[in-house]
Regions:
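Active-site neighborhoods and metal-handling regions in enzymes and metal-associated proteins
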Residues: 1-409
Length: 409
């Protein structure tokens, strides 16, 4: 049984964004719901709930409780359902007035009964047992409901007369368009990368391993940002090509002539920054510099053509054409993606995509080439930068200089 509780404070003492931002996000979602003829939207996902309300807890990865459910109806205030010990978290971070709490949420019977409780609130907000209910699923962006399948089956069974609609499109249509506050957070996060890179260039010493570099950058990021994940860091000395891994393995040396791919992952207010780079260890020969410059040119061309109305697939085509004109190739079918509080969001800048770029998106533009040298070493070239789409083009967010391409003297 859920209890509806009253707020202790009329306004949250620690909101991550102002009331006007909260109101605008919910308003835009309701507009999308009207277009899709949805009566109610039910969201279980951490980042969707965080985006629309500001609610944040470390308890989403474990599934030993259901940490939060957000329900939004067209003509009613949003409702948050949380374990009773998270009531203060809702009040501290969010402007939500309708808070429902579950008691003894760790008890298995109550945990497995939560979907039925959510269904009852859904019917209450619809004013009926029938209607169209949006859930986190669909083609765009790979959105999912992060609960056990049996919980979702129970939820659906309790709403047997409801028409469920995959509503990822409606959610992403709101989340893809960034406010000035979001762009600012992304910019600060990218600036953290730039600062950490400059620190690395200044302080790197021969004898460091791949892990030493990864830990150094991570420690620096924590001085400049709120949080960071383990950096993506891979040396060409690895015996097998291992993309997008953290630098946790011992004994991977960095030697003159090697290449190192590095992508720090700082977060500011939950928003991911990036300025992915590849470095030549020690002075780079002309052949290497030529490859690096062509990959950099690929990102530059992508930025030059990024503006509202351009399809994301055409940006990918331009990247491929630029690399091919330089005698190289793009090793991935993707040249970027949207960014926000998910590290990768729609739209995908990928082969054949027809999605049109829109003003106030923030996009990661990237191109990469992988090859194996005569010694069997796996060498990576390329990088990634962010752009903010404006009315007639785009602006680069803070980015590390492309003319600094070597690490170690």
């Amino acid at each position: 049984m859920l209890d509806k509780v009253e707020r202790m404070y009329a306004t949250p003492p620690y909101p991550p964004f102002p009331r006007a931002e909260y109101t605008d996000r919910v308003r835009r979602l309701k507009e999308e719901m009207v277009k899709a003829e949805l009566d109610v939207m039910v969201m279980w996902g951490e980042n969707n709930i965080r985006y629309f309300t500001g609610f944040l807890t470390n308890h989403f990865p474990p599934v030993t409780v259901c940490p939060g459910v957000l329900i939004i109806a067209i003509n009613k205030e949003p409702v948050m359902i949380v374990p009773n010990f998270f009531q203060g978290v809702v009040e501290g971070f969010t402007f939500i007035n309708d808070i429902r709490v579950q008691h003894n949420p760790h008890v298995t019977e109550n945990l497995r009964g939560m979907p039925r409780e959510v269904a009852e609130v859904t019917k209450e907000l619809m004013g009926s047992s029938k209607g169209r209910v949006g859930v986190e699923g669909g083609i765009k962006g790979g959105m999912t409901i992060p609960r056990p399948l049996n919980d979702i089956d129970e939820f659906r069974a309790a709403l047997s007369e409801v028409e469920f609609v995959y509503a990822a499109d409606q959610i992403w249509n709101v989340r893809m368009i960034k406010s000035l506050l979001e762009v600012e957070a992304l910019s600060i996060a990218c600036q953290a990368d730039v600062k950490a890179y400059h620190d690395l260039i200044a302080e790197f010493e021969w004898g460091w391993t791949e892990k030493d570099v990864g830990l150094f950058v991570r420690k620096k990021l924590l001085d400049y940002a709120d949080e960071c994940l383990p950096n993506l860091c891979m040396s060409s000395r690895r015996k097998v090509f291992m993309a997008d891994i953290p630098a946790w393995d011992e004994g991977i040396p960095l030697m003159p002539g090697d290449r190192l791919v590095l992508e720090p992952l700082p977060q500011v207010k939950g928003y991911w920054g990036s300025s992915g780079r590849t470095f030549h260890m020690g002075p780079a020969p002309e052949e290497e510099i030529h490859k690096i410059q062509i990959l950099d040119r690929g990102r530059q061309v992508a930025a030059e053509m990024t503006k509202p109305g351009v399809t994301s697939g055409s940006i990918m085509d331009a990247i491929n054409d630029t690399l091919e004109d330089g005698g190289l190739h793009c090793s991935l079918d993707q040249g970027g993606h949207g960014v926000g509080i998910d590290g990768q969001e729609p739209p995908a800048i990928a082969l054949g995509e027809t999605f049109e770029v829109q003003e106030n998106m923030v996009l990661a533009l990237e191109c990469w080439m992988f090859e194996t040298d005569d010694n069997g070493h796996h060498r990576v070239y390329g990088g990634e930068d962010y752009v903010h789409v404006t009315k007639d083009g785009c602006d680069l967010l803070p980015t590390f200089p492309t003319d600094i391409m070597t690490l170690g003297k």
